[in-house]
């Protein structure tokens, strides 16, 4: 038995650290990261099925323009007035050189998403898309469209419990907005 313990303790596997590596040089697992402002906006448009994939052509539209359903990379960025959505999610200042982008996480970002007309419009579109299905299947479809996965049994049970209240029975847009604002949507593991 002592020989077995000695062999295990002296092995390279036993001596490896279990702490997170900042450089992650061996790429054993991806570090968790938040979507950038552009990626977040585009992901919401894709989830709601509204992203325009055709050649944009013509004049660029502001990010805040409700008719702008193109990718954010094609949007007009004003150096004087940076869009509030982009500003909340660490879009770099267009007036100065930025070698890299900072990443901050603040409560204001969640509040902005929960009160954003852009996010509410995407959520309403998602809610309207699956009107013909029952509750359980509708929840399943929303999870698949927004989070690209099925809900876990506990998530499904919690979601069904949410809709048992008759006042919330028709609040599918609110439910879709909660999924769009969730960490599972905002972050990639």
Q: What is each residue range found by the language model?
A:
Residues 1-10:
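Alpha-helical secondary-structure segments
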Residues 2-3, 15, 20-146, 150, ...:
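An acidic, gly/pro-interrupted, aromatic-rich
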Residues 13-14, 168:
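Residue-level marker of structural boundaries
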Residues 157-167:
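Amphipathic alpha-helical segments that form the core helices of the histone-fold
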Residues 171:
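Active-site neighborhood of thiol-dependent amide/isopeptide-bond enzymes
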Residues 175:
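Globin-like tetrapyrrole-binding proteins
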């Amino acid at each position: 038995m002592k020989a077995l313990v000695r062999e295990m303790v002296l092995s390279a596997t036993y001596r490896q650290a279990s702490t997170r590596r900042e450089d992650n040089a061996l790429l054993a697992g991806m570090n968790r990261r938040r979507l950038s402002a552009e990626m977040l906006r585009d992901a919401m448009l894709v989830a709601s099925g509204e992203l325009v994939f055709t050649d944009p052509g013509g004049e660029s539209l502001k990010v805040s323009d409700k008719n702008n359903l193109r990718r954010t990379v094609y949007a007009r960025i004003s150096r004087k007035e940076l869009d509030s959505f982009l500003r909340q999610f660490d879009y770099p200042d267009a007036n100065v050189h930025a070698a890299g982008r900072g990443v901050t996480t603040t409560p204001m970002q969640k509040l902005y998403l929960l009160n954003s007309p852009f996010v509410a419009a995407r959520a309403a579109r998602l809610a309207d898309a699956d009107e013909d299905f029952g509750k359980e299947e509708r929840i399943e479809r929303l999870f698949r469209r927004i989070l690209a996965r099925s809900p876990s049994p506990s998530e499904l049970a919690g979601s069904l419990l949410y809709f048992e209240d008759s006042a919330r029975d028709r609040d599918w847009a609110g439910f879709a907005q909660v999924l769009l604002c969730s960490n599972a949507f905002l972050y990639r593991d």
